């Protein structure tokens, strides 16, 4: 244990010192007067930088397969509403505190999201919302090096240490790493866990953006213990002792270590050059000097010649990506799931839209996959896949119509074939596309992947593919209002019963959903609200709460002539009662039950954020109302109570060299 602490301390210190060991590299301004290659007399070529480095110093974007442009970039800033600490009660997105690894085992989200793209589904996977995956790591483009150091803790034994650094070591070439050490404290046990998360990324954009390359390494080491599952709910509701250790649970000694590794590399090259042309014109102007003499000045005028638009079906950009994903579980059953995949794609969407918006954007590709599962060294199953995909976007005046489709075909099975087809119409009300109206329709067909005995797959040929048909609309007004409504038709829906056997619905059902997100501001007062309204025509197949809400009311002010920024406010969460699925810790499965309802309880937090130059401080009183509750009824799931009152605090330093 002492050696492990020493290794951990040394690693954190090295990560903290890395920003000072790397020399700052700043992207130089592009020299438009430099001649590059043969050109027409009087013309000069202005090569383009990636959009992400044009508008600021530090930006990041997320990995997306078959992407050749930085479509959206984000800037690290002060996070309001106390979100610096992992929220163990984000039930809307399905994050609950059921295990002491990270911030809790995921639950089925209160607001299901049907129609999502096809992907490998692993039931019982630990913490997909918190663990690092290729889909949520960050790639950066920076003008100056950027570093981040953070420490978060509580009055219990929780703590989080994070160190991150990114910089462009040469124009267009960025390297970065992000390491997090977590020690979440057990709620109902005296044990604790130490978890490690690390990702290292690099990406390169040539000066004209034609050559692009990305690579990433992602590693997780997560310990998961049983952290609840009361054998007697009355012991919790009637006992007001703050010492939860020793509370009777279902499987007290269940624990395992998850060790995950993912690798990704990709490169793409555009056959279409990207540049603007400039012509210099010199003119002579005469003016009267102070001594009444005529002074002649040479005035240089630069004309921008419109870019020569390529053909709609141009040569486009070609790319290839390869990935390796390993998820290993030891100590309980030594299960290992691995997937090898590649992606070959072509797209004619190579110009940034502010330069030239292609009226017909086409992306096509194919993605072969190979997956297999081992338990204790014995291969239990493997499967080869071939996944073709296509996406077409057509400009219709100011708006656009997008159609996309993908398939997952098991090469060694004639019956296994998944598919997804979607169509979206987007109409922007302004040129900046800040106010939009969107309508969509999505159809999916997915064969159930039932991962029982942890990651071992138990296929049942009797089960029909789960088919969904979704129609919906969404209205966005800047960042103030986001309203969406949708209706989804389910056929052959599949779930687990109380005996952990798969059950298929004999009748179809409808799920109606509405989501309203608002960010209101009146001077220095802010009110962020998220309201969910749902109705399932068959709650036995699809149990959901009728109403859920998440609200943040806070003041955001600057003090001492803008030197200090402060945010003081409250968070409130609530959802109506419903028959929530229950959790089985041994298999990691959620199964339907009709004996106990959860919900009908309000959770309240109070937080204070302070930002002084590049340092951010926060304190947060989590679940403050638990201090005066007459009876403990704050269950997240049947037999799984939530955490009581907890006091969190933390500090984050950001360095722009």
What positions do the PLM features span?
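Small/flexible residues
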Residues: 4-7, 36, 517-521
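Membrane-proximal, glycine/serine-rich, low-complexity loop/turn segments characteristic
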Residues: 24-261, 271-284, 430-433, 639-645, ...
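Exposed, low-structure sequence patches enriched in small/polar residues
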Residues: 253, 257-657
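Bacterial Sec-dependent N-terminal signal peptides
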Residues: 1-32, 316, 620, 645, ...
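Short, solvent-exposed aromatic-acidic interface loops
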Residues: 12, 218-223, 572-574
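Phosphate/oxyanion-binding loops and surfaces in catalytic or ligand/nucleic-acid-binding neighborhoods
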Residues: 16, 209, 577
């Amino acid at each position: 244990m002492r050696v492990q602490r020493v290794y951990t301390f040394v690693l954190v210190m090295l990560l903290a010192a890395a920003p000072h060991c790397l020399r700052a590299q700043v992207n130089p301004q592009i020299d438009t007067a430099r001649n590059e290659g043969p050109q027409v007399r009087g013309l000069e070529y202005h090569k383009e930088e990636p959009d992400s480095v044009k508008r600021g110093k530090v930006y990041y974007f997320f990995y997306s397969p078959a992407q050749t442009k930085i479509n959206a970039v984000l800037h690290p800033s002060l996070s309001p509403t106390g979100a610096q600490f992992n929220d163990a009660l984000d039930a809307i997105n399905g994050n609950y505190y059921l295990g002491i690894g990270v911030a809790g085992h995921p639950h089925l989200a209160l607001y299901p999201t049907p129609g999502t793209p096809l992907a490998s589904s692993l039931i019982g996977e630990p913490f997909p919302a918190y663990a690092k995956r290729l889909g949520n790591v960050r790639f950066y483009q920076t003008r100056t090096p950027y570093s981040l150091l953070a420490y978060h803790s509580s009055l219990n034994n929780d703590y989080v240490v994070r160190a991150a650094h990114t910089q462009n070591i040469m124009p267009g070439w960025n390297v970065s790493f992000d390491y997090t050490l977590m020690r979440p404290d057990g709620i109902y046990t005296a044990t604790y866990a130490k978890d490690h998360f690390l990702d290292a990324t690099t990406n390169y954009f040539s000066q004209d953006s034609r050559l692009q390359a990305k690579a990433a390494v992602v590693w997780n080491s997560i310990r998961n213990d049983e952290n609840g599952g009361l054998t007697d709910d009355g012991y919790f509701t009637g006992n007001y002792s703050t010492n939860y250790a020793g509370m009777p649970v279902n499987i007290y000694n269940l624990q395992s270590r998850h060790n995950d590794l993912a690798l990704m590399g990709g490169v793409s090259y555009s056959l279409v050059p990207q540049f603007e042309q400039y012509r210099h014109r010199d003119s002579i102007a005469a003016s009267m000097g102070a001594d009444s003499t005529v002074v002649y000045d040479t005035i240089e005028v630069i004309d921008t010649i419109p870019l020569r638009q390529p053909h709609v079906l141009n040569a486009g950009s070609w790319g290839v990506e390869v990935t390796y994903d390993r998820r290993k579980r030891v100590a309980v059953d030594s299960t290992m799931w691995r997937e090898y995949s590649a992606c070959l794609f072509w797209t004619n969407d190579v110009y940034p839209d502010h330069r030239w918006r292609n009226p017909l954007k086409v992306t096509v590709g194919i993605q072969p996959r190979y997956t297999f599962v081992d338990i204790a060294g014995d291969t239990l199953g493997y499967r080869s896949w071939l996944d073709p995909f296509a996406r077409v976007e057509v400009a219709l005046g100011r708006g656009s119509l997008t159609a996309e489709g993908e398939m997952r075909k098991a090469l060694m099975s004639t019956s296994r074939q998944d598919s997804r087809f979607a169509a979206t119409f987007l109409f922007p009300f302004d040129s900046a596309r800040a106010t939009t109206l969107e309508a969509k329709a999505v159809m999916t067909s997915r064969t159930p992947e039932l991962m029982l005995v942890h990651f071992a797959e138990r296929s049942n040929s009797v089960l029909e593919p789960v088919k969904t048909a979704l129609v919906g609309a969404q209205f966005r007004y800047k960042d103030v209002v986001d309203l969406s409504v949708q209706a989804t038709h389910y056929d052959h829906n599949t779930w687990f019963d109380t005996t952990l056997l798969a059950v298929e619905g004999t009748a179809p059902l409808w799920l109606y959903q509405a989501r309203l997100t608002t960010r209101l501001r009146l001077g220095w007062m802010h009110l962020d609200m998220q309201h969910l309204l749902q109705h399932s025509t068959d709650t036995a197949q699809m149990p959901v709460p009728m109403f859920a809400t998440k609200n943040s009311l806070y003041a955001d002010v600057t003090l001492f002539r803008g030197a200090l920024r402060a945010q003081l406010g409250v968070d409130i969460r609530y959802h109506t009662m419903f028959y929530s699925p229950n959790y089985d810790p041994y298999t990691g499965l959620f199964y339907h039950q009709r004996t106990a309802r959860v919900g009908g309880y309000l959770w309240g937090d109070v937080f204070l954020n302070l930002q002084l130059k590049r340092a951010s401080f926060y304190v947060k009183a989590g679940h403050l109302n638990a201090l005066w509750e007459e009876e403990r009824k704050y269950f997240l799931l049947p037999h799984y109570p939530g955490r009581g009152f907890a006091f969190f605090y933390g500090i984050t330093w950001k360095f722009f060299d």
